[in-house]
Amino acid sequence: MSALSTQERLLQVILAPQITEKATRVADKYQQIAFRVRTDATKPEIKAAVELVFKVEVDSVTVVNVGGKVKRAGRTFGRRKDWKKAYVSLKPGQEINFAAGE
């Protein structure tokens, strides 16, 4: 892969920050940020993507594969997609503040 296509891939790895009550508690207690990432993303890719996009130093990455829920509409059953969540630990002194839009 060329350097350009690698950088394009890294920009597509992070889908969205996961801002929930649980993610906020984890961020306050363990200094970890939760992100929704592509299902085929690896830990090194997630680390490189966070460092590239947010200009911070990453200490570690923990990944959780979340199974999609079974939902029902009348008689028919459907299923939501499986997705992947990444908890990213930042090195001391580093911070990402989503409320400020940084």
Curated annotation (Swiss-Prot):
GO terms for biological process: translation. Keywords: Ribonucleoprotein, Ribosomal protein, RNA-binding, rRNA-binding. The keyword Ribonucleoprotein applies. One of its GO terms (cellular component) is ribosome. InterPro entries: Nucleotide-bd_a/b_plait_sf, Ribosomal_uL23-like, Ribosomal_uL23/eL15/eS24_sf. The keyword Repressor does not apply. Pfam families: Ribosomal_L23 (PF00276). GO terms for molecular function: rRNA binding; structural constituent of ribosome. Part of the 50S ribosomal subunit. Contacts protein L29, and trigger factor when it is bound to the ribosome. Belongs to the universal ribosomal protein uL23 family. One of the early assembly proteins it binds 23S rRNA. One of the proteins that surrounds the polypeptide exit tunnel on the outside of the ribosome. Forms the main docking site for trigger factor binding to the ribosome. This is Large ribosomal subunit protein uL23. The lineage of its organism: Bacteria, Pseudomonadati, Pseudomonadota, Betaproteobacteria, Nitrosomonadales. The gene is rplW.
